[in-house]
Structure formats: structure tokens, C-alpha cells
Design a protein with these regions (language model features):
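Rossmann-like dinucleotide-binding cores of NAD(P)H-dependent redox enzymes
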Residues: 3, 7-37, 42, 130-177
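Hydrophobic pocket-lining residues within nucleotide cofactor-binding pockets
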Residues: 10, 47-48, 188-189
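Single conserved hydrophobic/aromatic residue that forms the stacking wall/gate
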Residues: 184-193
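Short acidic-glycine loop/turn motifs at beta-strand connectors
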Residues: 83, 178-182
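Rossmann-like dinucleotide/flavin-binding elements
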Residues: 1-5, 43-58, 69-76, 92-156
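A short, gly/pro- and small-residue-rich
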Residues: 79-93
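Conserved acidic residues
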Residues: 63, 85, 115
Length: 193
């Protein structure tokens, strides 16, 4: 059996979507090693349908193909300002922090480490994102959720941990627009802040 992994790191959402503080990578690595010992092979940086086709797999002797496409694409709200620098999906944020060293300002793709961070949503991914932002130095981090706290899909334990870490909760609210501004300096004429 061969697993074709699209990313450069094996483990899927367990590695790129769940922060280390909630699921340590070494635990995921133990599971991956167990699969290897059972004979499972892993090929990284391989997108079935792009890097390798179904016909290629069939020609290579694969008798069956199971498509496990992983976490779905994020849902965007389609409101003005979604494309501003610093506004991103939790999927992108967590992937960049977890796999691309984006918490390091010297990395090739650093994330803005805002002092004030708002995460829109009430699920486990939102809790992971807001708690990650706190760990990256956000002095004020808040969850903005359109329903009540009791209606949040996040596990109660995740909400509890977020509160213990100082996360604020603004429920029964939903953004209708993200507002940004341009800061002009003599060095960079069009840096969005």
C-alpha cells in the first residue's frame, strides 16, 4: 500500500492543521512509523491527478485507489476586505505556522503577528487559531461567533482552554466588512497595515 501525500510532510491535517500544543507531532510520528512497519509506503509532494495520474497508478500495478482528500477548503464569507494582508483562513494560518515556520519573522513566508487578533468562527479550528495567536504574542485575541456560546461546535474543553488562556468571546456578532488602512513611510509607499 502506498500513501501519496500532497505536502512535504506526512500526516495530513494531524500535522498541519492541529497545533503542536494540542497534538504533539511526535505522537503522530509514532502512528506513521507504525504504518511503515506494517509495510505502508509514503510518497510526499505528490498530488494524484496532477503529479501522477490515475492511468499512471493503474500502469504501475495499483489495483485500487482510495481518495482521502483531507480537510476541505475553507469557507469564505465573501465580504469586502477578505483579501487584505493579514486576513486569512484558519487553514492557511495553521498550515503556515505548523509546517512552514511562519511564526519565525525570518522565514520565507512569515505571518503577521498581530497584537490584536480576531478569529471568526466557533469550531475547534477557530479555537486552535486563536490559541496559536496567543502563543505568538497576541495581547488581545478574540473569537467572534454569530451564535451563542452554547451553540458553538467546538468541544467544551477547547472553549475552556481558550478562556483560561485569556481569549475573549464576542458572540452573536458577525463581521460584514474587514477594514484596513495604508501606512505611508519614506521606505515603503504602499504597505498595508
Amino acid at each position: 500500500m502506498t500513501v501519496f501525500e500532497a505536502l512535504h510532510e506526512i500526516g495530513g491535517v494531524l500535522k498541519y492543521g492541529i497545533p503542536e500544543f494540542r497534538l504533539p507531532n511526535k505522537i503522530v510520528d509514532v502512528e506513521i512509523d507504525g504504518l511503515r512497519k506494517m509495510g505502508v509506503r509514503f510518497e510526499k509532494d505528490c498530488i494524484v491527478g496532477k503529479t501522477i495520474s490515475y492511468d499512471d497508478l493503474h500502469a504501475d500495478g495499483f489495483k485500487g485507489v482510495f481518495v482521502a482528500s483531507g480537510a476541505g477548503l475553507p469557507n469564505f464569507m465573501n465580504i469586502p476586505g477578505e483579501n487584505f494582508v493579514g486576513v486569512m483562513s484558519s487553514n492557511e494560518y495553521l498550515t503556515r505556522v505548523n509546517l512552514m515556520d511562519a511564526a519565525n519573522p525570518e522565514s520565507d513566508t512569515p505571518v503577521l503577528q498581530g497584537k490584536k487578533v480576531a478569529v471568526i468562527g466557533g469550531g475547534n479550528t477557530a479555537m486552535d487559531s486563536v490559541r496559536t495567536a496567543r502563543r505568538l504574542g497576541a495581547e488581545r485575541a478574540m473569537i467572534v461567533y454569530r451564535r451563542s456560546e452554547e451553540e458553538m461546535p467546538a468541544r467544551l474543553e477547547e472553549v475552556k482552554h481558550a478562556k483560561e488562556e485569556g481569549v475573549e468571546f464576542l458572540t452573536l456578532h458577525n463581521p460584514i466588512e474587514y477594514i484596513g488602512c495604508l501606512l505611508y513611510t519614506s521606505d515603503a509607499a504602499d504597505d498595508l497595515i
